[in-house]
Regions:
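Intrinsically disordered, low-structural-confidence terminal and linker regions
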Residues: 1-43
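Phosphate/NTP-binding elements of NTP-utilizing enzymes
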Residues: 30-40, 47-57, 61-152
Length: 152
């Protein structure tokens, strides 16, 4: 019997019921499997799992929340996704103590600019914003993210 290629497995998974936990978990597994051969596809699959798992958290089943966090961790570690990192590191904080999630709609644009530094699309990013907008705190998170990926 012929063995299915990774792409065939992914196509079958994408055609399957993606509200099923096992299918989503398998899709995240395939994102990891194809990481070395197709990083862009890997990121798309992981983001798909991330958003579907987040939507399915409304069912009240904790396993979807855990899968959402697994997808965030995968994106933060393997794809150096700063937005995912910010969401992941604060997942266990009390909602009223979180920095990023409540401000995400306002500062997502800045997070994306910082992502361009990580992706080596920018050499320098100059940030000029009024006091109290979160520049320093976001900068501290950014430094911790960079130090985690480049410890030396």
């Amino acid at each position: 019997m012929a063995q299915l290629s990774n792409r065939d497995i992914i196509i079958r998974l994408l055609k399957s019921d993606l509200s099923d936990y096992d299918n989503l978990l398998s899709l995240l597994g395939m994102a990891n499997e194809v990481l070395s051969e197709d990083k862009e596809l890997s990121k798309k699959l992981a983001n798909k799992v991330r958003f579907l798992a987040l939507r399915l958290c409304s069912t009240g089943d904790i396993k979807y929340y855990n899968l959402y966090n697994q997808a965030l961790l995968f994106l933060a570690q393997k794809h150096k996704d700063f937005d995912s990192y910010l969401l992941y590191v604060e997942k266990d904080r009390d909602p009223e103590d979180r920095y990023y999630q409540p401000r995400r709609n306002k500062i997502y644009w800045l997070v994306q600019k910082m992502q361009r530094l990580i992706d080596d699309e920018l050499d320098i990013l100059s940030i000029s914003m009024p006091p109290g907008t979160g520049k320093t705190t976001l900068g501290e998170f950014f430094i911790s993210f960079v130090m985690g990926h480049y410890p030396n």
